């Protein structure tokens, strides 16, 4: 087999000047311009037998067509073990991350080294360090070769995103790639983060017992979902589990309320989890026409498909807000997510995105709001007890050395904290006047309402619920102090009284 391959040694690659020409990545060597599409490494056997070169180098720059031809030939000869070393290294990192249960993989490329870190149970842990040139090769192949959807060719100097699907232990994992250039020598540094989206475990939430919340939170969610129409907003920071919660809520509606007979449509960017009973659409932006808003167009299309329930993956801009408002006002039940830190700040964000306060305050428009956060849960096998001197409470901290049960981290899994708001007429009056401070005070007054339900209900903040779980021995006291800070004595007493009533 004769294959014309343009090749360079690793030293040449490191010294090479790469540039863009007509949206193509090019390199220049000895005044000859070449298009660069794929960086691969092959062992000696295949360099001699397949590439037919008298003089061979460790790395090759090959055209896309030649890359496909090479891979096809290797696969047909069942020599998968001889595929790109770089691809193998990527798979090793991804496999290790999933084995740890990591939510994200961080590549922090500095002038000489690149630090690889995993986020496990909300905490960053060191994985390993590699040479910066090795990191560049990893990112180049990950983006250009392994990504399924992406923008042109990898360019460290521009913010870029991509979606990747990798099969690990016979299961398909989705990865969301994003990088941003960092300050450094020669403009070569960057921070790349790969979010891991784990394969569906086929769990379907068909009743409120499956939701996994305490009685107070379950009651609030049931009241929000049982309205005939309106907007249900799930908020939280990045990585707070909003998509997982949306899946549960939609399945609850489909099986519990509609008895499996409704038309549920989703508009997502991209689809993250398979939702039983829903017709899911993944929206792809048109890179050639930045003026188009595919999200808003997809929402309008969804309204014409005879839906009972519409789910919009995320509120991002004014056109999406307007399209979503039209869907709610036309009598549909709609669910969506937004980035916000509390239920009251969600309303402020909607106002900032162009949704008028009088529209939000219209009776029936807003079904409810949740704000959520995932925090690490203490390992029950090795947590350490002590007395909090300020309040004289028995609390726990993470064991610095951990144990085998928690991979010596001191934490095992994550705990969902949920803040809920089911709006009353008084709340809506304050929303209409955009009196956010009074709305917050009104919301906090609900802490004193006795519901008879286990757990902290409406009126309690995420911080309150984190401390409640400190008292229950589920959350590390030091973690709480670091991420939430001190509670005043009045708030602490209210939470402690609720804790005593439950135990």
UniProtKB/Swiss-Prot annotation:
Pfam family, one: T2SSE
Residues at which ATP binds: 236-243
Function per UniProt: Involved in the translocation of the TcpA pilin.
Disulfide bond sites: none
Gene Ontology MF term list: ATP binding; ATP hydrolysis activity
InterPro entries assigned: P-loop_NTPase, T2SS/T4SS_dom
Protein name: Toxin coregulated pilus biosynthesis protein T
Gene that encodes the chain: tcpT
Any Gene Ontology CC annotation: cytoplasm
Gene3D superfamilies: 3.30.450.90, P-loop containing nucleotide triphosphate hydrolases (3.40.50.300)
First-listed, main subcellular location of the protein, grouped into a coarse class: cytoplasm
Family label: Belongs to the GSP E family.
Gene Ontology terms describing biological process: protein transport
Organism this protein belongs to: Vibrio cholerae serotype O1 (strain ATCC 39315 / El Tor Inaba N16961)
Keywords for this protein: ATP-binding, Cytoplasm, Nucleotide-binding, Protein transport, Transport
Compartment list: Cytoplasm
């Amino acid at each position: 087999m004769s294959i014309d391959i343009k090749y360079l040694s690793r030293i040449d690659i490191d010294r090479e000047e790469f540039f863009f020409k007509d949206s193509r990545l090019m390199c220049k060597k000895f005044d000859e311009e070449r298009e660069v599409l794929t960086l691969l490494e092959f062992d000696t056997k295949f360099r001699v037998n397949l590439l037919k070169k008298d003089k061979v180098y460790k790395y090759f720059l090959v055209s896309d067509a030649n890359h496909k031809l090479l891979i096809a030939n290797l696969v047909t000869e069942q020599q998968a073990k001889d595929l790109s070393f770089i691809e193998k290294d990527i798979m090793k990192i991804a496999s290790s991350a999933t084995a740890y249960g990591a939510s994200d993989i961080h590549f922090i490329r500095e002038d000489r080294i690149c630090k690889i870190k995993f986020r496990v149970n909300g905490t960053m842990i060191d994985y390993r360090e590699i040479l910066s040139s090795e990191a560049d090769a990893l990112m180049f192949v990950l983006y250009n070769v392994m990504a399924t959807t992406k923008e042109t060719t990898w360019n460290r100097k521009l913010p870029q995103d991509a979606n990747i699907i990798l099969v690990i232990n016979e299961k398909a994992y989705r990865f969301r790639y994003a990088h941003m250039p960092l300050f450094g020598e020669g403009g070569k540094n960057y921070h790349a983060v790969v979010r891991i989206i784990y394969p569906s475990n086929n769990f379907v939430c068909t009743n409120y017992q499956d939701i996994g919340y305490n009685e107070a939170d379950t009651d609030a969610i049931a009241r929000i979902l049982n309205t005939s129409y309106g907007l249900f907003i799930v908020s939280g920071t990045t990585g707070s589990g909003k998509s997982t919660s949306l899946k549960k809520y939609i399945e609850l509606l489909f099986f519990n309320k509609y008895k499996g007979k409704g038309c549920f449509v989703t508009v997502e960017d991209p689809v993250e989890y398979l939702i039983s009973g829903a017709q899911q659409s993944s929206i792809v932006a048109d890179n050639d026409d930045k003026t188009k808003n595919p999200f808003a167009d997809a929402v309008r299309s969804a309204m014409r498909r005879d839906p009972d329930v519409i789910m919009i993956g995320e509120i991002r801009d004014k056109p999406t807000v307007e399209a979503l408002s039209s869907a709610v006002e036309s009598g549909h039940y709609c669910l969506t997510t937004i980035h916000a830190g509390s239920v009251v700040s969600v309303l402020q964000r909607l106002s900032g995105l162009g949704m008028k306060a009088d529209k939000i305050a219209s009776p029936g428009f807003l079904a409810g709001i949740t704000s959520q956060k995932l925090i690490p849960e203490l390992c029950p096998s090795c947590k350490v007890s002590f007395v909090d001197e300020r309040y004289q409470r028995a609390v726990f901290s993470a064991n610095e050395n951990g144990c085998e049960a928690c991979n010596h981290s001191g934490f095992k899994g994550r705990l969902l904290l949920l803040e809920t708001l089911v709006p009353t007429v008084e709340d809506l009056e304050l929303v209409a006047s955009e009196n956010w401070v009074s709305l917050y005070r009104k919301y906090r007054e609900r802490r004193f309402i006795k519901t008879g339900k286990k757990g902290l209900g409406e009126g309690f903040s995420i911080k309150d619920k984190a401390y409640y779980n400190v008292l229950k021995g589920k959350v590390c006291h030091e973690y709480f102090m670091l991420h939430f800070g001190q509670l005043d004595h009045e708030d602490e007493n209210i939470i402690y009284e609720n804790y005593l009533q439950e135990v």
